[in-house]
Curated annotation (Swiss-Prot):
One Pfam short name: EcoRI
Gene: rsrIR
GO MF: DNA binding; magnesium ion binding; type II site-specific deoxyribonuclease activity
Keyword Hydrolase: yes
Coiled-coil residues: none
Protein name (Swiss-Prot/TrEMBL): Type II restriction enzyme RsrI
CDD domains: EcoRI-like
EC number: 3.1.21.4
Record field: catalytic activity: Endonucleolytic cleavage of DNA to give specific double-stranded fragments with terminal 5'-phosphates
Cofactors that this protein relies on: Mg(2+)
Main enzyme class: hydrolase
Family classification: Belongs to the EcoRI type II restriction endonuclease family.
Subunit note: Homodimer.
GO term, biological process aspect, one: DNA restriction-modification system
Length: 277
């Protein structure tokens, strides 16, 4: 799978390599650093990788920063020569901000076990707390939600193409900000005025813009294991992204726990192909 390898190894050697590169923060995401909000998803992924190296010392893992469109097309052509034909930019790739975590199976193949992304959209809470009005005339409490978050669908679709021969789909997306509130709540401005964030407001909420990636299944759940659904006379295997949404920032510990659960689900599903002895 083409793409730059950031970390690679097994057991203690992998842990030491990550510590040397990133310091001790990622190593403590299940402890002292669990409540931090300032660790990037790249650092959280590195911390999850150290935990995997600790729990599965005989398995070799690697973290890639990207997956090229060329590699995706090669995989598609291996399924059917009619697929994977269109490529205009040789260097085209997807680069999930949490990277692509893989494990080497007993046949020497690298298998994707975790892909993570973290997106923020909607700064209304921060603006209200600061007493800043928004809009062109600077007379509104809220800014109409944008559509930037919809770009995540491209990465999800590309990874689906790459993993059509797998029984798992370990794509995790953490969405945060006022555009992803799952319940209504109140925020007080510095002047004492109380503003209500309404979670089902069409002006603010953008969760419905992303649930196509999860076939509108419930949010905040691990959907790593694919499901087979009967539609008419056809059976379809669905690859469903695991979407985690809330208005407040996700802590490093919350992201790490969800990502570790997805990675371990992947390892369980492909266990027969792994050499853990």
């Amino acid at each position: 799978m083409a793409g730059e390898v950031e970390f690679k190894g097994k057991g203690q050697a992998l842990r030491l390599g990550i510590q040397q590169e990133l310091g001790g923060g990622p190593l403590s995401i299940f402890g002292a650093a669990a409540q931090k909000h300032d660790l990037s998803i790249r650092e959280v992924t590195a911390g999850v990788l150290t935990k995997l190296a600790e729990d599965f010392p005989n398995l070799e893992f690697q973290l890639r920063t990207s997956l090229t469109k060329k590699a995706i097309n090669e995989k598609l052509r291996s399924f059917d020569p009619r697929l994977g034909q269109a490529l205009f930019v040789e260097s085209a790739s997807i680069r999930p901000d949490g990277g692509i975590t893989e494990v080497k199976d007993r046949h020497g193949n690298w298998r994707v076990i975790l892909v993570g992304e973290s997106k923020h959209q909607g700064n209304d809470v921060e603006k209200i707390l600061a007493g800043v009005l928004q809009g062109k005339a600077k007379d509104q409490d809220f800014m109409a939600a944008g559509n930037a978050i919809e770009r995540m669908h491209k990465n999800v679709l590309e990874l689906r193409n790459y993993m059509l021969d797998e029984k798992h789909f370990p794509y995790v997306v953490f969405l945060q900000g006022s555009n992803f509130a799952t319940e209504s709540f109140e925020v007080t401005r510095p002047d004492g005025r109380v503003v209500k964030i309404v979670h089902d407001s069409g002006m603010l909420n953008r969760i419905d813009r992303v649930t196509a990636s999860s076939l509108s299944r419930e949010i905040n759940q691990n959907y790593c294991e694919n499901i087979v659904v009967r539609a008419g006379s056809f059976d379809h295997m669905f690859q469903i992204a695991s979407l985690y949404c809330k208005a407040a920032p996700w802590t490093a510990g919350e992201m790490a726990e969800a990502m570790l659960a997805v990675a371990k689900t992947s390892l369980r599903i492909i266990a027969d192909d792994l050499d853990q002895n």
